[in-house]
């Protein structure tokens, strides 16, 4: 079994790993960690929600939260990383997006437009 490992961003970039979770009691949480190409910690945070519609919604909220976090830190070149392939798929369909996540994804796009460059992987 292959153990997942963290891959650093390019020199001059930051990487923000984020995740969302739903719990059996119906609550949810999001979190994000920002590191540079050396793995040096540049910030992180977690947010609790009194509700959780579903796991994909929490992943989308985590992405939104991560973009806000890096902007607060003054970052301009950021790679965002998630383990949620469904979110990556929805993000790449941006112009065709009509799901219940469309509003959140558009907000993320608007928030990220002030960054020099960012990507999702």
Question: Across the structure, where does each feature detected by a protein language model lie?
Answer:
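Primary recognition of RNase H-like, Mg2+-dependent phosphodiesterase/nuclease domains
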Residues: 1-121
């Amino acid at each position: 079994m292959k153990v997942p490992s963290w891959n650093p961003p390019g020199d001059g970039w930051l990487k923000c790993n984020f995740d969302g979770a739903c719990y059996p009691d119906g609550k949810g949480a999001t979190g994000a960690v920002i590191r540079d190409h050396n793995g040096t910690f540049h910030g992180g945070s977690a947010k609790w929600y009194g509700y959780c519609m579903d796991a994909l919604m929490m992943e989308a909220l985590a992405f939104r939260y991560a973009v806000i976090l890096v902007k607060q830190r003054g970052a301009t070149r950021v790679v965002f990383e998630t383990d949620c392939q469904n979110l990556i798929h929805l993000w790449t369909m941006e112009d065709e997006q009509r799901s219940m996540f469309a509003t959140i994804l558009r907000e993320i796009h608007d928030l990220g437009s002030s960054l020099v460059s960012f990507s999702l992987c």
